[in-house]
Structures are given as structure tokens and as C-alpha cells.
Swiss-Prot record:
Transmembrane segments: none
Gene from which the chain derives: usp46
Enzyme Commission number(s) from the entry: 3.4.19.12
GO cellular component, one term: nucleus
UniProt similarity note: Belongs to the peptidase C19 family. USP12/USP46 subfamily.
UniProt name for this protein: Ubiquitin carboxyl-terminal hydrolase 46
């Protein structure tokens, strides 16, 4: 255990008692726990995402429900379930937990994370959600195959076998998956073709002094395909000028928005951070939806923000702010603090292009209202 980890545990009592005092005994939510996570050497990218996901209630509830199922072989999901269960069943309301088992499993499963370097929180989120979904789908596939076997081990032939081989969406998809529709209109024959594409999170470009609504509008701006970028129209049987646009067709239960704050600079031969000020509201409604979108009036509430602190992707630090039972908390590895809602503005970014460290919202989690 490192000196930093020992110090984390030594400071646990001080931080915990201060947090309980800030929240107040009468206001402290029943059956809720606020636990920091020990940093095992530049694992703040992991800690910040885990805290955000823990406070996405539908995700937490499904992970905890997975924990109570029959004993399974260790994988990333079982380790995640053990960690969430450990937090949720603590006798104390606040404190610090070392996610050692989860980090060890993560490093075993993916070489990208098997080091002590700073990693990208968005890459980790993407990897985690896809891995959990893959594990669930593989388990369901095995269950279906086992269900088609007779007691003597021979397969039962059924007319519905192709249907049984079809992979159903998992609870990861039910929570985070939305659908984009890519519409292309030929400017010669006016034929519109569309192609759907599923997503677990949306990555949007950022500009200086804008808002999330502006970023999403830009994401869905109409683009003209001309010159060498002409579109091959099936109806015209030739390349034609066309207009292309992206719309949201299916709105997810939880919308994860990734702000593309790291840009490769050719002259520097490296990625640099765009610390632009991008306002993210506490409430969000999407306006870049397709005409046939389901629940197009869905209102979202901000529940968590992964914040990048520093000047570049491979240096700096990640923290998380979450909303829990009407108030806001800041998780900085082992430290947990209650913050005012007004303090969220500090994480919008910088109003000027001055090259200095900034604390900027990087991944936003919006949960839809019932």
C-alpha cells in the first residue's frame, strides 16, 4: 500500500465526520452511502467514472441485482457488483473504500489500463459499458443453449432456433442506448435515405463560450456533400450533391454526453486540451430529434459530471460531481465533500483561451424523468 493510500485511510475519519456534519443527521438520506475510492496510482479516471455510474440509479440497481444472483466466475462485472455491494452495505454512512479487486481485474483484462499512467475517462467508460453488456449477452446465450439441451446432453431441434440465437438487449442497452438516424437527401432526385446507428454515449465537438444545447445543435447541422465528397445515389445511379444530417431517433433513459475536449495539434504533434467554457444546464431537452422520434419531449436532469482538471489528456486529474437526493457532492478519489449547486458553474471551463489548468466538464450524465 502506498503512502498516499495510507494517508487516505488516516484522513478518512476527518473527512467523513465533516461530510456528515455538512449534510446534517436529519437530512442524511436513509439507506444512502457516500464513500470515496482509494487511488491506486493514477486511477482517478476509473474512480471518477465509477462514482458517476453509482449515482446513475438504474445502473446501480441492476448491478446490485446482479450481485445477488448465483455464484459466477470472476469477471469485470462480478468485481463491479462486489464493489457496489460493498458501498451499499457499509454500516457507516460515509468513508473510504479501496477498489483493489476491480482495478486488478481491469488491468488483467485490458493492457491499455495495465499501467500507472493517466488514462482517458471516456475510453474507460466506453470499455466498461461494452464489457458489461458483452458479459450479460454471453451469459444469456449460454442460458439459452443450456435450456435447449436434454438431460442426456443432446440438443433439442426447434423451429424457433434462429429466433433463440438472436441476442436481446441487456439492461446496459435499456439504460444507455439511444439511436441516431443518418439522413441523406439527394439534391438531384430528392430521394431521402436513412441509416440507423445505436450509441451508448454521444461525443460532441466544443466551441468557446457555448452551451450543451449549442453543441448538440451543431452535431445535427445539415452538411452539404459536394465536389470530391459527392454522394452515390442509388436512384440516380451516379454521384450527386446531397445534404446530410444526423438526428436522434431514440432517446436513451440516461444520456451520456462526452465533450471532445482533446484535439490533436499538428504543429505540436500532440493532443492539447480545449478548456472552452461550455455551459451545461441542470435540465435538458433535446431538440435535434427526428420526426419519428419516440418520447421526443423527454426532459432530462443532470445527475453526474466527470470533470477533467489539468492541461492535457495524459496529465492532470479527474473528479466527479453528483446529485443525490436533492444536493450535490464532489468526489475526488478518497475525498467526498458537499457543494452548493452554484459551484457547478466552476466546471464549465475557461472564458478565454489562456493556456492554464482548468476544471472542465468532460462527461455529462443526464437521466430522463419518469
Amino acid at each position: 500500500m502506498t503512502v498516499r493510500n495510507i494517508a487516505s485511510i488516516c484522513n478518512m475519519g476527518t473527512n467523513a465526520s465533516a461530510l456528515e456534519k455538512d449534510i446534517g443527521p436529519e437530512q442524511f438520506p436513509i439507506n444512502e452511502h457516500y464513500f470515496g475510492l482509494v487511488n491506486f496510482g493514477n486511477t482517478c479516471y476509473c474512480n471518477s467514472v465509477l462514482q458517476a455510474l453509482y449515482f446513475c440509479r438504474p445502473f446501480r440497481e441492476n448491478v446490485l441485482a446482479y450481485k445477488v444472483q448465483q455464484k459466477k466466475k470472476e469477471n469485470l462485472l462480478t468485481c463491479l457488483a462486489d464493489l457496489f455491494h460493498s458501498i451499499a452495505t457499509q454500516k457507516k454512512k460515509v468513508g473510504v473504500i479501496p477498489p483493489k479487486k476491480f482495478i486488478s481485474r481491469l488491468r488483467k483484462e485490458n493492457d491499455l489500463f495495465d499501467n500507472y499512467m493517466q488514462q482517458d475517462a471516456h475510453e474507460f467508460l466506453n470499455y466498461l459499458l461494452n464489457t458489461v453488456a458483452d458479459i450479460l449477452q454471453e451469459e444469456r446465450k449460454q442460458e439459452k443453449q443450456n435450456g435447449r439441451l436434454k438431460n442426456n446432453g443432446t440438443a433439442i431441434a426447434t423451429d424457433t432456433e434462429p429466433e433463440q440465437n438472436k441476442i436481446d438487449p441487456t439492461w446496459v442497452h435499456e439504460i444507455f442506448q439511444g439511436t441516431l438516424t443518418n439522413e441523406t437527401r439527394c439534391l438531384n432526385c430528392e430521394t431521402v435515405s436513412s441509416k440507423d446507428e445505436d450509441f451508448l454515449d454521444l461525443s460532441v465537438d466544443v466551441e468557446q463560450n457555448t452551451s450543451i444545447t449549442h453543441c448538440l445543435r451543431d452535431f445535427s447541422n445539415t452538411e452539404t456533400l459536394c465536389s470530391e465528397y459527392k454522394y452515390y445515389c442509388e436512384m440516380c445511379c451516379s454521384k450527386q450533391e446531397a445534404q446530410k444530417r444526423m438526428r436522434v431517433k431514440k432517446l436513451p433513459m440516461i444520456l451520456a454526453l462526452h465533450l471532445k475536449r482533446f484535439k490533436y495539434m499538428e504543429q505540436l504533434h500532440r493532443y492539447t486540451k480545449l478548456s472552452y467554457r461550455v455551459v451545461f444546464p441542470l435540465e435538458l431537452r433535446l431538440f435535434n430529434t427526428s420526426g419519428d422520434a419516440v418520447n421526443l419531449d423527454r426532459m432530462y436532469d443532470l445527475v453526474a459530471v466527470v470533470v477533467h482538471c489539468g492541461s492535457g489528456p495524459n496529465r492532470g486529474h479527474y473528479i466527479t460531481i453528483v446529485k443525490s437526493h436533492g444536493f450535490w457532492l464532489l468526489f475526488d478519489d478518497d475525498i467526498v465533500e458537499k457543494i452548493d449547486a452554484q459551484a457547478i458553474e466552476e466546471f464549465y471551463g475557461l472564458t478565454s483561451d489562456i493556456s492554464k489548468n482548468s476544471e472542465s466538464g468532460y462527461i455529462l450524465f443526464y437521466q430522463s424523468r419518469e
